[in-house]
Curated annotation (Swiss-Prot):
One of its GO terms (molecular function) is ATP binding. Homodimer. It catalyses: tRNA(His) + L-histidine + ATP = L-histidyl-tRNA(His) + AMP + diphosphate + H(+). This is Histidine--tRNA ligase. It comes from Bacteroides fragilis (strain ATCC 25285 / DSM 2151 / CCUG 4856 / JCM 11019 / LMG 10263 / NCTC 9343 / Onslow / VPI 2553 / EN-2). Gene3D superfamilies: Anticodon-binding domain (3.40.50.800), Bira Bifunctional Protein, Domain 2 (3.30.930.10). InterPro entries: aa-tRNA-synth_II, aa-tRNA-synth_II/BPL/LPL, Anticodon-bd, Anticodon-bd_dom_sf, His-tRNA-ligase, HisRS-like_core, HisRS/HisZ, HisRS_anticodon. Keywords: Aminoacyl-tRNA synthetase, ATP-binding, Cytoplasm, Ligase, Nucleotide-binding, Protein biosynthesis. GO terms for biological process: histidyl-tRNA aminoacylation. HAMAP family: His_tRNA_synth. Its main location: cytoplasm. Its EC number is 6.1.1.21. It comes from the Bacteria.
Amino acid sequence: MAAKPGIPKGTRDFSPVEMAKRNYIFNTIRDVYHLYGFQQIETPSMEMLSTLMGKYGEEGDKLLFKIQNSGNYFSGITDEELLSRNAAKLASKFCEKGLRYDLTVPFARYVVMHRDEITFPFKRYQIQPVWRADRPQKGRYREFYQCDADVVGSDSLLNEVELMQIVDTVFTRFGIRVCIKINNRKILTGIAEIIGEADKIVDITVAIDKLDKIGLDNVNKELAEKGISGEAIAKLQPIILLSGTNAEKLATLKTVLSDSETGLKGVEESEFILNTLQTMGLKNEIELDLTLARGLNYYTGAIFEVKALDVQIGSITGGGRYDNLTGVFGMAGVSGVGISFGADRIFDVLNQLELYPKEAVNGTQLLFINFGEKEAAFSMGILSKARAAGIRAEIFPDAAKMKKQMSYANVKNIPFVAIVGENEMNEGKAMLKNMESGEQQLVTAEELIGALTK
């Protein structure tokens, strides 16, 4: 009995229609990246585990897909090690490679390995899949695409400004209304300092980053469980829940963080970004959000997140500044900043809001009906001219019944059908049928092309 076919949990197949929609997303993002001078690279699907481990925190390391070595990988493992049942230790013995978790760490590795060939500042983009051994659920997959853009080799805040312009341009092209949220890790560090818990900055940021998901009471509970004092938690409340305009929030922060040099630096950086963007005429809202803390360990400056306003869904884009990601690979002092568009969530938003342009998801424009060998040969001549003019066209491969061929056109939403029988061949023309209106007209090859390209 044949095995029932299936795919791993957290992965998906994509139909031709879905792929047309996904390519619309990728192509839109790619076009905007090119507009801002970014160049494309690709890195391998698998990296050495030594490259990946320790870059995403303890939780991130648990979500790495590890690849088993080829050959007799148990030969070098002692009975004692096997009996210990220490999964992490055993995996290190017979797994040297892993599937990439994101595109940022492989990019840092790429920069270090190719430093002599790269012109800095290096503006790169990358659109590739990543894998995470997460528990699959609605909107969360084990295999998904990221669409990253990063600038490395420059600490200018103009890079942050440009990335926010890219975000605004992309979502304006999609027709999705968004709120661009920004914060700064230096502000969060300053807050940790002034509440007397400077050494707990990671615990604080991980907890408050969950505010939207679990609510304030649960955030406070998690902070207490991490050993943060009740007094510090009380001091934290009015700061992270600060309201008002961006300018009002910045003014308050200057007072609140007056004793923190690091915190004031973060306020200064945020003020520059927000003030510069104000002169750029962004189409979308931008908000300074002090609860934005993005849990990844490597952010050191500005951090960003984008939320769709008309759909209940998580973050659809995120990013931030990292000052020494390449340092772990032996190349210290290279500052960078980047963003990552969540293509899968953008796909869901565009579906829910029905924002895909018709031309983006349309396939074949013209189908030639096949009545037999002579008619097909005649049709192929017109078909070649149509394709040369950029018309997406095909001929039904078999001389099947007319009903079957017309049904094929209907199911595939092909808007025009060309019918070539003996009478049409005698006149050197084709009968062009509009499948929506039912209108038919006898046309030359040139007239057919004109009708479909106007």
